[in-house]
């Protein structure tokens, strides 16, 4: 039996996007459509497992898309690696509800760190990157890095020489970066 092809999905923090947390904004809706399209293309190309670090931005969007696809593709898997068990405790109620629905519907849940561990979100990103064959990231490389977990995770993926598929959040363009080439 062939080893399943795994794709980690991540993105910049929602506040780095022009629309922030406003998922009703047309730009956010278009981004979600592009993300869904790229996930479906990856499925057609043989990706059968998607891994998320359970963040309340791109990770949640991707998980909801994959869970939706799983209703008709029972071989598709969503693997959720939470930074720690109480991650969503302080989230807004509407996000918390979606988070728990995501976890209820996923294939696997695993907490990466103990509650209170420093850099838990970064550790969760590193975990999914280590397990993945490639990384799908919603990321604007033209914005200066802030030192966030997301910035560090993308740099980590590059350092691990993972193939990257980048979606620009505003332009909705994609860029494929092979593991054999320099990402810059």
Language-model features, listed with the residues they occupy:
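Acidic/glycine-enriched connector segments
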Residues: 1-184
């Amino acid at each position: 039996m062939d080893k399943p092809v795994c794709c980690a999905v991540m993105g910049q923090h929602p506040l780095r996007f022009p629309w922030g947390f406003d998922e009703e904004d047309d730009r956010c809706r278009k981004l979600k459509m592009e993300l869904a399209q790229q996930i479906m293309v990856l499925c057609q190309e043989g990706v059968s497992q998607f891994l998320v670090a359970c963040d309340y931005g791109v990770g949640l969007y991707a998980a909801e898309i994959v869970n939706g696809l799983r209703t008709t593709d029972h071989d598709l898997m969503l693997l959720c690696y939470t930074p720690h068990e109480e991650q969503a405790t302080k989230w807004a109620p509407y996000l918390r509800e979606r988070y728990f629905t995501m976890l209820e519907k996923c294939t696997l849940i695993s907490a990466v760190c103990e509650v209170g561990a420093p850099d838990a979100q970064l550790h969760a990103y590193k975990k999914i990157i280590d397990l993945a064959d490639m990384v799908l990231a919603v990321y604007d490389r033209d914005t200066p890095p802030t030192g966030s977990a997301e910035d560090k995770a993308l740099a980590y993926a590059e350092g691990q020489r993972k193939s990257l598929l980048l979606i620009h959040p505003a332009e909705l363009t994609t860029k494929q970066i092979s593991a054999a080439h320099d990402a810059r």
